[in-house]
Amino acid sequence: MEHYDWNDGWTFTPVFDPAIVRPECPDLPLTPVRIPHTVRTLPYNYCNENDYQRLCGYRREFFAPKEWQGRTVLLTFEAVAHDATVFCNGRRVFHHGCGYTAFTVDLTESLRLGEQNVVAVRCDSREDLNIPPFGGQIDFLTYGGIYRAVSLDVKEPAYLRDIFIEAQAEGDFRIYTSTVGETVGCTLQAEIRSPAGSRALYSGELSLPIVGTLNGVHPWSIGHPFLYTLTVRLIRPGTSGLPDRVLDEKSTRFGFRTLQFVAGGLYLNGQRVELRGLNRHQSYPYQGYAMPDSIQQLDAQILKKQLGCNAVRTSHYPQSQAFLDACDELGLLVFVEMPGWQHIGDESWQAQALQNCREMVCQCRNHPSVFLWGVRVNGSPDDEAFYKRTNEAVRRLDPTRPTGGAHIRRKDQLLEDVYAYNDYSYTGRGAGCENRSAVTPDLRRGYLISEFGGQQFPAKTFDDEPHRLAQALHHAAVLNDAIAQPGVAGSFGWCMADYNTHREFGSGDRICYHGVLDSFRNPKLSAAVYASQKTPRSPSDIVLEVSSSMALGDHPGGFAGACWVFTNAESVRLYRSNDFIAEFSPDRRGRFAALPHPPIEVQDFVGSLLEKYEGLDPVVAPQVAAILNEMRRDALSLSPLSRARLLSLRLSWNDLLRMYYKYIGVLGSPSSVYRFEAVWHGRTVRTVVREPVQSVRLECTVYNPLLTDGPTWDCAAVSLRAIDQNGNFLPYCGEAVQLSVEGPVRILGPSVVPLRGGMAGTYLATTGRAGRAVLHCKMEGALDTEAVLTVRKRS
């Protein structure tokens, strides 16, 4: 058994020429490339989807040693977008019609042993293909290229094709295998290795599953994602005194856990889980889909650790094994979905969609994080015959998980186990989501909200403060009402990050600004809604995000309006120029009472200042303060009750205006300094200070500064933010940042990037060498900054 990473040594042509498949290739203009690769890099916005739609070609030459005689040589592509035909030495050996699942090509019969050989790939990324997700409009770009890893395996003629383990929380398991080649007389050996390293061996026959019980297992859960490793060996017993021979072995990680999805919700190991997740596209600025494993894994870490999600939906296609591996490790539940968007094609299209479902399940079913199969094309109409087939195919391959699928209409035909509904009913008023009984045709089955938010309230990082706040409160309202409604298993916001899209969608610049993060994964205010729902276990877990910059000019008429604090602290203290104003706690009876940590509306900006500085009576001062806070909230308007109270207090309108502008409006008064303190376990653990900007600094954060070149090129994600002297980001800073690098990395995308909403990003890719790398960042009006990276080389 030999394994080779095959991600270097490729050449590429943007225009396919049949000559590229021949061993003796004429002098074609081929460009050396490394995998993952995109057929065309695109600008950040105002891109053209036609640019990546092309028929192109890849070619790789290699030497096949004579020692491979009598062996099986298998070439695996983790994904090629979207229609791939593979040639070996000029001979067509395989065709694959899905851009989101892996496929394996048997090269054995086409090789010339002891000679140079050629593998070529005809890659078609045009969107007129009669395969999913194509055929109708699509609200995301589909890109193109060999964008996931490639590998070569040399095996015996008989080998293991697949292994699958069903493992329950109590320790019971069943192991299924499939083989290729002559296996008469062969046996199986299964080894289960625990997280602590202990091993248990089990023997079995090829014709039957291996059944057993492992005592004392640690179940996989969201909070404790214990992973075990299964290794299955195909053994040919020895004869004439010779030892047994291991023909092949295959390993996979898995978890012992039990799933139930019923009318009351999702139960994991007997405990109900309130799903709180986001939808994720696997695309990135400039590169589209073509990013290495570390960047895929980073998204999972952002979802779980930064945003506090416990679930993610792979909209609208299966995503990389690296992403699912990270979800397994982190305890992030995954709703995996078949490729497609609203359209159902003809019989040929449906046959490919059915094959996509089979590949999706076979390639993802050992991941304990996967809890639901999406077997309907997102948002598509009913098609009883087609969806009976998708459900049957998936249930046959994996009877342990429920099926679902995203509906956009009420009372659709329900052939799945779970009615998943894209609920865009909330417009800022009324209920945050529809009543379950008005949507699902069968209240006895599971129900979840597969999308919300998104198109109903997009927000850009450079939108004004009221708009950014409104998006955050929109997400909070739907999250709250989904939790509050019995029978709703949870919800998935649309979506994790902004993404490029087709001309029919988005804001006219080919971007849908639907994310709680921007395209570079920088957080918007709405990200704090999710992050603040985490249960804190240490001071570092405390979130404190204040919606307002306290700059009155960002609001019509100079009236600051609402100020919300998104936090998971026990309370928040407010100070004005070192004077204590008030301490605020979450309202457990208010609009967001169902959330684990409701956002806090700051409604008092006066506190006891009137007693201290105006000498008002302790009985009178709170009444006047209430009127001043009302004026702040309602743009100097007073209710009839407040006007009557003003008369009873013997205060003139001019007296009131003077105090308003002194303590709230600051007109003619020195600018105030506001300090917000998060209180947890009785002490201040996080502080936010709002005051006029005195200095601007460029903050450069590298999320993965230790890179490993091999088995593919690696990449560092870089976040750039303009911040003030207190670390507050500056949403209206639009300066350009000039980037340059030293050492064994290169910049993906432009070397000069503008800050959008005070934020930007870039990516640094390895170049095949090891060493120290430095990123230099320059911005007018700020000190230069740099970040240091280390690149290791792995063969």
Residue positions per predicted region:
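Carbohydrate-binding surfaces of carbohydrate-active enzymes
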Residues: I483-L706, I723-Q725, C733-G734
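Active-site-adjacent substrate/metal-binding segments within catalytic domains
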Residues: H37-A64, W68-T76, A81-C88, F94-G97, ...
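Beta-strand-rich binding/interaction modules
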Residues: C88, D172-G204, G561-E583, Y674-A678, ...
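Beta-strand-rich structural segments
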Residues: I175-S178, V232-L234, C563-T567, D714-P731, ...
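Extended acidic/polar, glycine-enriched regions
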Residues: R112-Q116, S178-Q260
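Substrate-binding/catalytic cleft of secreted carbohydrate-active enzymes
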Residues: R174, I302, A311-A528, Q533, ...
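Accessory carbohydrate-binding/adhesion or oligomerization-edge regions at the termini
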Residues: M1-P43, R122, A472-L479, R521, ...
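Accessory beta-strand-rich segments of carbohydrate-active enzymes
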Residues: H3-F16, T38, E49, Q53-L160, ...
